[in-house]
A protein has these predicted regions:
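Structural core positions within WD40/WD-like beta-propeller blades
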Residues: 11, 59, 97, 140-141, ...
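Blade-level signature of beta-propeller repeat domains, shared across WD40, Kelch, NHL, RCC1
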Residues: 282-342, 347-376
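A structural motif specific to WD40 beta-propellers
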Residues: 29-32, 75-77, 122, 162-164, ...
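Blade-terminus and WD-like Trp-Asp/Gly-His loop motifs, strongest in beta-propeller folds
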Residues: 2-8, 48-56, 88-95, 132-138, ...
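Repeated scaffold domains used in trafficking and secretory/extracellular systems
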Residues: 1-2, 42-50, 81-89, 125-133, ...
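Surface-exposed loop and turn segments in beta-propeller and other repeat-based domains
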Residues: 35-41, 165-174, 216-236, 325-329
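Structural motif
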Residues: 18-21, 65-67, 104-113, 147-153, ...
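Short loop/turn segments that connect beta-strands within beta-propeller blades
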Residues: 25-27, 70-73, 115-119, 156-159, ...
């Protein structure tokens, strides 16, 4: 589920049917259903959606024509290029960032920046896993995935100088691939990343420090390859879309396959489980613009849980501090050679990883591979 950042609207993605539902967040009334416009690519990927920053406008991309839902109905953006699998509104709401690129660029290295009215297409930096905007504005976070490691790429946005995001040198590095779009807390003090391709991980970082305050595996840790089928079944019972920040500062909610919502207090490092009304497995969890939690379960039921407090307002100071501690990359040079990487505990300046010569079994896969490559040189 993807909630509108300002209005009481929810977009629900049905990957089995390859359809998008639009609900009124105040009473969970269905406002529309948008069926897939193109056949499945066979990878189990459903449509991607993006809400307009202010208006009741939803873009739907599924590899065919990009379509637009409004309260008046569904229309096709006929001036847009076709073939996009993911889209995001730029902060000015007049441009759309889209992947994969349909220009002559390398799909890994660049994306498209499309004018919403004319369909005119320019180039932006590469990304592959959704775009998360900091609630105070001026900064976005997206992912660049690789089987060995995934980079969390930060970029300036909405500063009036360019419609494309401007990539910054400071970046996150996550083990392996297969992550979902990151989410920021309403007050902008935390960001959470749900993953990954091999096990159910959850990482939460403070912002702007990027210190890791929670790194855990949901359910049982991996028993190692080859994976027993019963472990795979239990692992796959967890929804990949089961986290949300509510109104209480520093609290992350986690939906479970046993019909509970876990209230995780990041500051006190404590958690408390709450039963959902149906007792069925949580299949999706999101927070509305007002801070209410919306829970979808395995029975198909949708429940809204009222917020217990007013939603916090993010301060621009955190973004200002983050930007002051980094700089733009040179768009004409190799990206990865310019990045200052952190995993939330350690930091590597450009060139540092080429000299790392030791790693333990507890280190992430990407770091152990890097050490092996350094020894082979």
């Amino acid at each position: 589920m993807v909630c509108h950042p300002r209005l009481p609207l929810i977009a629900g993605l049905d990957f089995g049917r390859e359809a998008v539902y639009v609900w009124d967040a105040s009473d969970l009334r269905t406002l529309g259903v948008v069926e897939a416009a193109s056949p499945s690519d066979g990878r189990g990927r459903g449509p991607a959606v993006a809400w307009h920053p202010e208006d009741p406008v939803l873009l739907i991309a599924d590899g065919g024509p990009v379509r637009c839902w409004t309260p008046a109905g569904v229309s096709e953006l006929t001036k847009f290029p076709t073939g996009y699998r993911n889209v995001a509104f730029g902060p000015d709401a007049r441009t759309v960032w889209a992947i994969p690129t349909v220009t002559d660029g390398d799909p890994w290295e660049c994306s498209d920046v499309v004018d919403l009215e004319s369909g005119a297409c320019g180039k932006g930096p590469g990304w592959d896993t959704g775009v998360a905007a900091h609630p105070a504005g001026g900064l976005v976070l997206t992912l660049r995935s690789n089987q060995g490691a995934t980079l969390g790429i930060f970029a300036r946005a909405g500063d009036g100088h360019t419609v494309a995001p401007r990539v910054l040198r400071r970046a996150l590095i996550l083990d392996v691939d297969g992550y979902e779009t990151p989410i920021f807390s309403p007050d902008g003090r935390y960001l959470a990343v749900r993953g990954n391709a091999y096990v159910n991980t959850l990482d939460v970082f403070e912002f702007p420090s990027l210190d890791n305050v929670l790194s855990t595996t949901l359910g049982e840790p991996s028993p190692g390859y080859p994976y027993p089928q019963d472990w795979l079944d239990r692992m796959r019972a967890w929804s990949r879309h089961n986290i949300a920040f509510g109104t209480r500062p520093g609290v992350l909610w986690i939906g479970t396959p046993t019909g509970t919502l876990v209230e995780a207090d990041l500051g006190n490092q404590r958690s408390l489980a709450h039963d959902i009304p149906s007792g069925a497995a949580v299949t999706a969890l999101a927070a509305t613009a007002s801070g209410d939690l919306v829970v979808a379960d395995a029975t198909g039921e949708l429940v809204r849980l009222a917020a217990s407090a007013d939603r916090a307002v993010a301060s621009p100071a955190a973004v200002t501090d983050f930007l002051a501690g980094t700089s733009d990359v040179d768009a004409d040079a190799d990206l990865e050679s310019q990045l200052v990487l952190t995993d939330g505990a350690r930091t590597w300046e450009p060139g540092d990883l080429e000299t790392v010569d030791t790693a333990t079994d507890s280190d992430p896969t990407w770091l152990r591979i890097q050490v092996q490559m350094n020894h082979a040189r």
